[in-house]
């Protein structure tokens, strides 16, 4: 019997609910080498939804206007800061707008390489100076308030991306719970 569920209809086949990610990750449909988020502690199953995101490569379903993670390989980053600089800066402008959301927002660039590797790549393979690269990263961090995570490799970047999304989701759930409690207290006081 074929189903659209993540598991067969036999409830004994269902995964432990604690191991299923409680939110759906939106993956930009234009992402060329997307993360799959397979077996990243504490989750064994992470629901994914491929969709054209207006900003970034990863977000949370129904929170796409508030959270984004832009994934970059080392060569992607160098190309984005040199040849694709104007386009990349427009992306930062959109990420900055997202962070100003009234309910709170977060934007981050996750790089599949440590900063020292990025600097070495720039020195060896581009005409961009290391000082220019670092100046751009620092300047854009300050100007747009976008966070950067330099990770030792792709798998670590994938784990970091899931952890960022999960932490944002948890804090958002906590905020929603507090708002509901305040609302119910206000209704009780009115009665």
Q: Which stretches of residues belong to each language-model region?
A:
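Non-catalytic C-terminal interaction segments of nucleic acid-processing enzymes
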Residues: 1-64, 76-191
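Conserved catalytic cores of phosphodiester-cleaving nucleases, focusing on short active-site segments
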Residues: 67-73
């Amino acid at each position: 019997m074929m189903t659209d569920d993540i598991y067969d209809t036999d409830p004994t086949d269902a995964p432990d609910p604690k191991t299923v990610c409680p939110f759906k990750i939106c993956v930009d449909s234009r992402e060329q080498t997307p993360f799959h988020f397979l077996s990243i502690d504490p989750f064994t199953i992470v629901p994914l939804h491929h969709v054209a995101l207006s900003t970034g490569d990863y977000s949370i379903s129904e929170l796409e206007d508030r959270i984004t993670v832009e994934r970059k390989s080392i060569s992607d980053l160098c190309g984005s800061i040199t040849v694709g600089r104007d386009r990349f800066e427009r992306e930062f402008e959109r990420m900055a707008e997202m962070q100003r959301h009234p309910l709170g927002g977060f934007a981050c660039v996750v790089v599949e390489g440590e900063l020292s590797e990025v600097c070495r790549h720039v020195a060896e393979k581009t005409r961009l100076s290391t000082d220019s690269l670092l100046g751009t990263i620092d300047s854009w961090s300050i100007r747009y308030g976008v966070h950067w995570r330099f990770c030792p490799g792709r798998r670590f970047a994938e784990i970091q991306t899931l952890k960022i999304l999960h932490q944002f989701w948890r804090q958002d759930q906590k905020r929603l719970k507090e708002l509901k409690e305040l609302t119910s207290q206000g209704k009780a006081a009115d009665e």
